[in-house]
Amino acid sequence: LSLVGSEMCIRDKAEAKEYTAEIIGHEHIIPTLGVWDSFDEIDFDSLPFQFVLKTTHDSGGVVICRDKSNFDLTAARRKLNKSLRHNFFLDHREYPYKNVKPRIIAEQYMEDEDGKGLKDYKFFCFNGEPRMMFIATNRPVDTRFDFFDMDFNHLPFAQGHPWADGPLSKPVNFEQMRELARKLAL
């Protein structure tokens, strides 16, 4: 993602989704179900049977609900309220987060064909061109990272997590994914 003119919106997940949708289209964005300033504002009756809650300003502040009838509201409140208190500017001196207001976003729950949640695809672009990508699998329990070049050759290095147990298949829509990454990088 190019930082020219966009630094202010990419630090907040809800704003980043809107910015990204303007560039590549809403059809490529996971639907937002709501955004709230606090956990107590969430109207759980309005949420579907499955959903995802996450804080808009950090990483790791995620609660996945696969079955609303068995949802642990107390644990979700505890986790998200803790994440809402996390301040990247004060804790890590990350200046772009200085004036970010922490919020909670609800998104549609999605999973891959294997029923194990979504694979996370990240493209690394240099000078506007995708040059490398990684696929994160098995999140959040047993996270695996696999890096690939743009010919989908597995790269022989790791970053904090082991490789997947078996070979990963090239996504059917890989070329479209690469083109969308290119658009975002310009």
Walk through the language-model features, giving the residues of each.
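Phosphate-binding site of ATP-dependent enzymes
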Residues: 47, 71-166, 178, 184
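Amphipathic alpha-helical regulatory segments at dimerization interfaces
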Residues: 22, 183-184
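Short beta->alpha connector loops
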Residues: 34-39, 109-113
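A basic- and aromatic-enriched beta-loop-alpha substructure that forms the phosphate/nucleotide-
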Residues: 16-24, 28-37, 43-96
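Active-site rim elements
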Residues: 6-7, 166-170, 182
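Short beta-strand to alpha-helix junction loop
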Residues: 10-16
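Single conserved hydrophobic/aromatic residue that forms the stacking wall/gate
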Residues: 1-5, 9
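Short, conserved clusters of charged catalytic residues that mark active-site
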Residues: 15, 176-180
